[in-house]
């Protein structure tokens, strides 16, 4: 059986780079002991691991902070590509983390987010395009470059917590995914190829009217609202040279993208006054606003070899970058609880030397 790998761009990129690292140092010293909490991680307290095994990613809080929604792949558990799960967060140290699948088990899913009533989620799914996991592109046909697919069969759906799909929110040709909601739950940001490029759009959840809010050539995705709903933050590629533009357009025409060069952008919620706030090179990913208006994001910019990925904080203008996580593989997808007291993220830490990515929650301290 052909092994399927996760098609979450930054997670898959990390796996590729770590596999290369493991191969090149196979004759080197033994791997260091697993670590749940590194001494340098001064902002984390009472860190707890919620999942154990598989690839668990994009874990995001409900508005009442009682549950999280996330996507999960686990070959050993018969989950060959990402499906969506909801779990109740433990209230005491001895309470286990329990979760259940709420996507259909058909196709591939991605990027789930709770609605304001805490009774529904929105997520992207390819299930209308077929029951099987859509195929992974053969990188050898593209010079072994790191690429990932933009499945045209992705649309965004709303489901209740029993998995019943209540509404299809997008129904246009091409990719529609990467949805997040505003703090008041009235607006939905998402990425779409409906106008020929990978751009950001905003949907009014009541009228379902959609407005395009980015227009520059390049991949715009992973967008979030600020805590007051007035700003948005996202990561974007901006091909500039003739060769870069040619490569980007050729890959996009085949439903592919090479997400290895991304920077963090901010704008007003309507897309106006857009500004690039990082100039770091490599992959700067998963940006989100902190409770005090600063920014937290994931990056591999410190490492020429492309890994590890760690989390950093910075001011909203890109100044004062501070490294806050220290795993030797992968730390990403940070989100603060609505009350700002806790942080949830995904990491390769404490995985017994495997490539598993798990979910962690911690108290946040300054």
Q: Would you name each region that the model predicts?
A:
Residues 32-55, 87-108, 160-175, 203-219, ...:
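Multi-bladed beta-propeller domains
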Residues 63-64, 116-117, 183-184, 227-228, ...:
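Residue-level detector of Asp-centered blade-edge/turn motifs that repeat once per structural unit
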Residues 68, 121, 188, 232, ...:
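Hydrophobic beta-strand positions that form the internal "hydrophobic ladder"
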Residues 35-37, 46-79:
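Beta-strand-rich domains and repeat architectures in extracellular enzymes and scaffolds
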């Amino acid at each position: 059986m052909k092994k399927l790998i996760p098609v979450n761009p930054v997670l898959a990129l990390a796996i590729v780079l770590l596999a290369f690292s493991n191969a090149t140092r196979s004759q080197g010293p033994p791997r260091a002991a697993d670590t749940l909490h590194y001494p340098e991680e001064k902002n984390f307290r009472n860190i707890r691991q919620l999942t154990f095994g598989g690839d668990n990613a994009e874990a995001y809080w409900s508005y009442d902070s009682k549950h999280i929604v996330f996507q999960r792949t686990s070959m050993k558990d018969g989950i060959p590509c990402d499906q969506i799960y909801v779990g109740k967060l433990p209230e005491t140290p001895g309470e286990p983390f329990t979760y259940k699948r709420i996507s259909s088990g058909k196709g591939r899913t991605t990027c789930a987010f709770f609605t304001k009533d805490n009774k529904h989620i929105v997520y992207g799914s390819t299930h209308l395009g077929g029951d099987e996991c859509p195929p992974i592109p053969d990188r050898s046909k593209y010079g072994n470059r790191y690429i990932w697919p933009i499945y045209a069969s992705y649309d965004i759906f709303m489901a209740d917590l029993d998995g019943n799909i209540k509404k299809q929110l997008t129904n246009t040709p091409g990719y529609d995914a990467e949805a997040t909601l505003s703090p008041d739950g009235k607006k939905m940001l998402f990425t779409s190829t409906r106008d020929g490029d990978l751009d950001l759009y905003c949907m009014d959840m009541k009228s379902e009217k959609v407005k395009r809010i980015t227009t520059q050539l390049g991949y715009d995705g992973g967008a979030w609202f600020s805590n007051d709903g007035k700003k948005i933050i996202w990561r974007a590629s901006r091909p500039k040279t003739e060769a870069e533009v040619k490569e980007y357009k050729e890959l996009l025409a085949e439903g592919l993208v090479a997400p290895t060069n991304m920077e963090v952008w901010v704008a007003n919620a309507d897309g106006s006054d857009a500004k690039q706030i990082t100039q770091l090179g490599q992959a700067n990913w998963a940006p989100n606003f902190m409770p005090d208006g600063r920014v937290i994001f994931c990056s591999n910019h410190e490492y020429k070899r492309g890994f590890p990925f760690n989390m950093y904080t910075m001011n909203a203008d890109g100044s004062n970058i501070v490294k806050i996580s220290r795993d030797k593989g992968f730390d990403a997808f940070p989100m603060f609880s609505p009350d700002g007291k806790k942080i949830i993220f995904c990491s390769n830490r404490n995985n017994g030397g495997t490539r598993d990515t798990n979910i962690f929650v911690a108290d946040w301290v300054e």
